[in-house]
Amino acid sequence: MTDTNLSSIPAYQKLKTLRSLLLRLHKALLDAERDSYERIHGRIATKGEFFQLVIGDPWFEWLRPISQFIVQMDEVLQAKEPVSPNQIHTLLARARDLLPLSETDPSEAAVRYQRARENYPAIASMSAEVTNLLDLAPTGENLNP
């Protein structure tokens, strides 16, 4: 299946939109965590040092599943081989479990994600966009078939 054929599939378009939203949300979450990290540990001097912290420091560990998921989406969206609709639907299903949206979830990832949503309006807005795109309405209603 070529990209031209895939681009007519609503799920493919949803995945492309999700990738863009998650990339922006991920950057905003990284920036928020950098601010928090620097308040405690001091200024991060270089982009290289920040990159090393992001990939190796426990402080940023909760964000790594989002990073890895973005890479997986890129692999599917940029695949030279045909991509099945099942692959796309599987990624969309995994995305629904990716973000710790529950305010009652006691995990560190959920607590930090909720804190970021509360402290940064842009993160709250992007989170809402992802939630709406993935049909994760708080009421449990599926807005799109």
Give the role of each language-model region:
Residues 1-145:
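Surface-exposed peri-terminal alpha-helical interaction modules
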